[in-house]
């Protein structure tokens, strides 16, 4: 599915991505010499409020091995941005313990579905089980009343 590209917004994302990589200690420039790399990074840091100039910086200074990763990150960010606009495509996140995720993942694989579908299935099964249990309890009560009379 294609999503509209918004230059200013995406340039800001690219700037943020590069700064985060730099803060994490990764090499973001194509320069081997540390003084050239430091100078290029300081130029990038000055471009925070001039997003369209980030593209020029990328063409001039960015390490080639980062190009594919940057494009993938921006593509994912663009998808999440546009999907967040509509309630039915908006993603929610939950924290799971590893063992819970592992059990859920195994169950989803058994069912041949996604994790979300597996959760939905398990909830509907639990609801159905509760209703059946309540019906059995009611029958037991009614039967015990009949027998005690």
Swiss-Prot record:
Homodimer. Required for spatial organization of the terminus region of the chromosome (Ter macrodomain) during the cell cycle. Prevents early segregation of duplicated Ter macrodomains during cell division. Binds specifically to matS, which is a 13 bp signature motif repeated within the Ter macrodomain. It holds the Pfam family MatP_C. Keywords: Cell cycle, Cell division, Cytoplasm, DNA-binding. GO terms for cellular component: cytoplasm. InterPro entries: Arc_rbn_hlx_hlx, MatP, MatP_C, MatP_N, MatP_N_sf. Disulfide bonds: none annotated. GO terms for molecular function: sequence-specific DNA binding. It is found in: Cytoplasm. This is Macrodomain Ter protein. The keyword Cell inner membrane does not apply.
